[in-house]
């Protein structure tokens, strides 16, 4: 089958991109290929469901720009489509004095990014927002909320198809042949021809990109599993909304935090441990070929050397419920190991370059017949409509 545009990947970014293209130009023939039998199965459907504000990201970066624009677009979309969401606000809490300068830097960054109402709060105010939370300093970020991103992605898919887009489920991409003005995409259920391939394959985005070019790719996806605990129901009162620690500025993860969920309940987590399989949601899941690729990547070896202490701490928390609880106790001293019930896990696709740099920003590249979204971790779900709009602009310039 022939299409002017084919999107690979039925996560929230791929679906948002397809929707944006069909909204901008309904006459373009667009298809989306997804290897699973449903959309939003992986990163989109296995995250903490937070609507991010843009607090953490370097001013002028793609993350800052797209998160702030995406936040407003997402809220409007949810309102228009009657998707349940709540703007709960959150607190970011320094639990030690040495974290206060980092907290102040976060506040300054948020203000530079245009956040409204974000401010330092007193410890009395902290007790008002989160009565059981402890710390030496805190900021309050009202532009933060919660939503079920799987519902959002499914609505993107519905509207994309109403506008004439086609979604092909169960179509795993096996091979891409590049010709002068077209690409032939071979899948597990047949072949497709397209003028423009848009790669939104998430955990396999580097693999798809490599299929589409002869040169060796200079980045590789490293899968990090994030594990969650649920707070047992009778102890959910310990958390009113969202409580975050001050993140390690050298590590691209936000640290274990507390999140009230849209479906009900409270989750604690995630940690960040190397997954031994790209879609390895359990400790026992191993793909030896994928693991060997990760371990042999020069960039990962440098990351492991640089962050080995942090990595060992995360691994210890993965296997020790007590250690996980101890990390949570820094924010809520009353939390007990017995309050935690093992929850689910997600796997984050984190791009790593050859020099050992964990890419801190979104990474979108284009070549002759393709656009590749190579790094779209958090806050990509919040930013999805904005990222989709950016990719849409790049795509429509070709027609």
From Swiss-Prot:
GO terms for cellular component: cytoplasm. Disulfide bonds: none annotated. It is an enzyme of class 1 (oxidoreductase). Keywords: FAD, Flavoprotein, Oxidoreductase. It holds the Pfam family DAO. InterPro entries: FAD-dep_OxRdtase (IPR006076), FAD/NAD-bd_sf (IPR036188). GO terms for molecular function: (S)-2-hydroxy-acid oxidase activity; 2-hydroxyglutarate dehydrogenase activity. Its EC number is 1.1.99.2. Catalyzes the dehydrogenation of L-2-hydroxyglutarate (L2HG or(S)-2-hydroxyglutarate) to 2-oxoglutarate (alpha-ketoglutarate). Active in vitro with the artificial electron acceptor 2,6-dichlorophenolindophenol (DCPIP). Also displays a very low oxidase activity in vitro on L-2-hydroxyglutarate with O2 as the electron acceptor, but this activity is most likely not physiological. Belongs to the L2HGDH family. This is L-2-hydroxyglutarate dehydrogenase. It comes from Indibacter alkaliphilus (strain CCUG 57479 / KCTC 22604 / LW1).
